[in-house]
Design a protein with these regions (language model features):
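Short glycine-biased active-site loop of nucleotidyltransferases that positions the nucleotide triphosphate
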Residues: 132, 338-344
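Feature for exported/extracytoplasmic and membrane-associated proteins, marking the mature portion
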Residues: 2-316, 335, 349-415
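Acidic/histidine-rich, metal-coordinating catalytic segments
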Residues: 323-330
Length: 415
């Protein structure tokens, strides 16, 4: 969207939020000293967060992770019949029980599962699945398939948890803001590199903020809103840089940390954030061709980073306060394709990890001999059941039905 000359009278709160200004990462405002008013706002927000110390972190595996080669049903002959070339033999797996084994690259996940800190949720999906990355991800981001919902489920959750829109309540570590965190009331903190506090939309946003002094009267609602955004970005940039500058951990996250050390640094700094969102970039899990090696490598990155994240939280004494949910926009088709990969599918596995999790298997395991349309796994668990479980079971919030626009049965997943 281009800011036109009539910005003075035409800017509306909703338009700015749509633009992405709701997730500001403003390097141009960096380096400023926090004024007493800013410090008081931060202190007030921190006190609110302390009242209920539970934090939810969400990790998105973009591209469509192959759940069948992640949590492998090695005891089911149908798995190998569908995948004669890319099926993973039992003697290579990290055996969990008498039916499932993890991909050989997932040593960290094996430890978490056997320590009772990881829940595996089977058959997660929704009716009439889309095989489009964009469309299916939008459904998962909004928790509203085929609805055109404007705001993300994490953003709506933030609004319901804290209708006042407390600063720094919601953090999205990424190059650009996810639909999942789009909110009516909250200004998500969106950044990629803490030292620069910059992301892809920075230059557009900097231009908009440069116009703030020209928006007329201080009582003008548009001016006040832009100034609130600028103030929020200024406060957040200082907090993020200080937190990252003070972070010094001996924990090894492996090759790709998936931005999880940044989350730990913010938690350890006392940032009042309740909801964090991180993700893989560039549809990394879209494994159409010669899948096995690249898929194992990606799962190793994920497993190493997530297990390190839990250890790092234990180091700072916050492991009991944090749950991590892991999802992908769809699974892969059950049969392998002719290029030794897999194509876009439907139902998939999800994971919830943390010290407060009752580890084990949840949901009905899909039947590999009774496939859905297109040789896909038939979903057995509506993914919103998992969201509802996190909202009510982990965060202790009773507004899940309103947020998700429906009643979804929860799992008894938390200690």
């Amino acid at each position: 969207m281009t800011l036109k000359s009539n910005l003075t009278t035409r800017i509306k709160r909703r338009e700015i939020l749509r633009k992405g200004m709701a997730g500001l990462g403003v390097a141009g405002l960096g380096g400023a000293i926090l004024k007493p008013s800013a410090l008081s706002r931060v202190a007030e927000a921190a006190a609110m967060a302390e009242a209920n110390g539970k934090i939810l972190v969400i990790l998105e595996l973009s591209g469509g992770n192959d759940g069948l080669n992640t949590v492998v049903p090695y005891a089911d002959d149908a798995y190998y019949q569908h995948r004669p070339e890319i099926g993973l033999p039992k003697n290579q797996l990290r055996i969990l029980d008498d039916h499932f084994g993890l991909n050989p690259g997932m040593a960290g996940f094996e430890r978490l599962f056997k320590d009772g800190k990881m829940a595996i949720l089977h058959g997660c999906g929704y009716e009439n699945p889309s095989y489009s990355h964009f469309t299916s991800m939008a459904y998962w981001h909004t928790a509203a398939p085929n609805s055109g919902q404007e705001y993300g489920w994490v953003g709506r959750l933030a609004d319901d948890l804290d209708p006042s829109g407390t600063s720094n309540f919601l953090v999205n570590i990424a190059a650009r803001q996810s639909l999942a965190v789009r909110s009516k009331q909250h200004v998500p903190v969106v950044f990629d590199q803490p030292s620069r506090f910059m992301r892809e939309a920075f230059f557009d946003e900097k231009e908009a903020l440069s116009r703030v002094p020209d928006i007329g009267n201080v009582d003008n609602p548009s001016r006040r809103f832009l100034l609130d955004i600028a103030r929020s970005a200024n406060d957040a940039s200082e907090l993020v840089r200080d937190a990252w500058g003070n972070y010094n951990s001996p924990v090894d996250y492996g090759v790709n940390s998936l931005d999880l050390p940044k989350v730990v640094s913010l938690i350890d700094s006392g940032m009042p954030t309740k909801l964090y969102y991180v993700s893989y970039r560039n549809n990394a899990f879209d494994t159409h061709v010669f899948q096995n090696n690249v898929h194992r490598r990606l799962l190793t990155y994920t497993s190493d980073a997530v297990s390190a994240f839990i250890r790092d939280l234990e180091r700072i004494g916050r492991a009991d306060d944090v749950a991590l949910m892991i999802f992908s926009e769809f699974g892969r088709r059950v049969p392998e394709n002719v290029t030794l990969g897999t194509d876009h599918g439907a139902a998939n596995v999800m994971f919830v990890v943390g010290n407060g999790v009752k580890g084990g298997h949840y949901g009905e395991v899909p039947n590999l001999t009774k496939l859905a349309k297109g040789d896909n796994l038939a979903y057995t668990t509506d993914f919103r059941r998992v969201y509802q479980t996190l909202i009510s079971g982990w965060l202790g919030h009773g507004g899940g039905s309103k947020i998700l626009n429906g009643d979804f049965e929860t799992f008894d997943m938390f200690v």
